[in-house]
A protein has these predicted regions:
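Small/aliphatic-rich secondary-structure junction motif
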Residues: 37-89, 116, 178
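A short acidic, glycine-rich active-site loop
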Residues: 86-99
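A short helix-to-beta-strand connector/capping loop
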Residues: 112-118
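Charged docking surfaces used in two-component/phosphorelay signaling
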Residues: 121-129
């Protein structure tokens, strides 16, 4: 029954997200009181900014963790057996530094006081790294921005949102339209 439940949950939730401008909360755990540990996955877009702003309003006295995950598997595949390992490591370090600068700039330009946000950068497959971050920090809520009414963008995001709604365990998920 869990598989059917997950399919219905995902399709119903995403259908609701597509037809309302209101945030949609998917409750996945028993309530333990107000949210204290809130995680915001970040791709540095306007939708992430909207999610971060709403998260800051929801938990005005808590620090928010903003997570950016990047993946270098394609780079590894292209460079494997073509470039010295030390050069691959240097390129990866450069990419990490660039992503860190992007995260720092995003947080600096956010509408949330810098003392209220904490950035975290992880390399890997985004759904797995998001779950690992939820587990490590014992996050209670994941606040994720979604696209507006653009059909192609909605279709693309639908896959990401669907994976987050289905795969994140141990935390509620709040989907926020930008």
């Amino acid at each position: 029954h869990q598989g059917v439940h997950d399919v219905l949950l995902g399709s119903t939730t995403l259908n609701l997200v597509h037809h309302t401008d209101l945030p949609v909360l998917v409750v996945k755990r028993p309530a333990e009181g107000p949210y204290e540990r809130v995680l915001v996955p970040a791709d540095f877009s306007e939708r992430t900014r909207s999610a971060l702003n709403l998260a800051a309003e929801l938990v005005p006295d808590q620090v928010l963790r903003v997570l950016h995950v990047y993946n270098l598997d394609a780079l590894d595949n292209v460079l494997r057996n073509r470039v010295e390992r030390s050069e691959v490591d240097r390129i990866k370090a450069d990419v990490r530094a660039e992503r860190q600068q992007e995260l720092d700039a995003f947080l600096l330009n956010a509408d949330v006081h810098p003392d209220r946000v904490e950035g975290q950068l992880r390399m890997g497959y985004a759904p797995d790294e998001l779950q690992a971050a939820v587990d490590e920090w014992d996050a209670q809520l994941v606040v994720m921005g979604t696209h507006g009414r653009n059909r192609l963008a909605d279709a693309l995001l639908g896959g990401v949102a669907r994976r987050v709604v289905h795969q994140v365990k141990g935390a509620d998920v709040l989907l926020v339209r930008s």
